[in-house]
Amino acid sequence: RYVQSPEMTGVLVRGREALLERIRPADEDPLVRRAAELAKEFSIFVHIGSTAIPLDGGKVANRAFLFGPDGGLITTYDKIHMFDVDLDKGESWRESATYSPGGRAVVAGLPFARMGLAVCYDLRFPQLFRAQALAGAELLTVPAAFTRQTGEAHWHVLTRARAIENGAWVIAAAQGGLHEDGR
């Protein structure tokens, strides 16, 4: 009885200004509030893969939230590895221009498993998942908003690799639908 959403649930937009116009502190964010309500209403675990939360100093956290069946917050995780790349065809990403990286690996003890939390680009850094496995994680989560170009080439391979390397299950909700820019 666990539900996971993708990375950047509710705020998948291009551009710093558009993002900053939409986001709210966690205690004022309607998505965060509703996720807690749904967890309690249906007595399930709800994992917001991540959403954008403003930080002091003008930066933003790419933060995952995990709520228990009572609606209480179990833990949060801030994405550690920023997606700063230049892809073919002029596509460029600089998450570090907007986001501040997290600084800690997170493993949550749940009744059905010890769960490690990660977000998207973190998938490319096996040492994070190894640290979680060594801390007892049996289930690794990687909600994502992988780009089509890198996702098609790497997504399935890397999720399988993290599972095999650590003898763990991987749950990895990915984005769907259309972006504002039509892709």
Where are the regions a protein language model picked out?
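Short, intrinsically disordered, charge-balanced linker/junction segments flanking boundaries
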Residues: 1, 163, 179-183
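Active-site beta-strand/loop signature of hydrolases that rely on acidic residues for catalysis
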Residues: 1-22, 39, 46-47, 122, ...
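Histidine/acidic-residue-rich catalytic or RNA/ligand-binding cores of hydrolases
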Residues: 14, 153-154, 158, 180-183
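Active-site catalytic loop in hydrolytic enzyme cores
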Residues: 25-27, 37, 55-135, 148-161
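An acidic, glycine-rich surface segment that forms the CoA-thioester-binding/catalytic face
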Residues: 27-44
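Glycine-rich, charge-decorated loop segments at or immediately adjacent to ligand/cofactor-binding or catalytic sites
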Residues: 40, 56, 180-183
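Short beta-strand-to-loop element that shapes/binds the nucleotide-sugar donor at the catalytic cleft/hinge
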Residues: 50-53
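C-terminal beta-strand edge segments of enzyme domains
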Residues: 169, 174-183
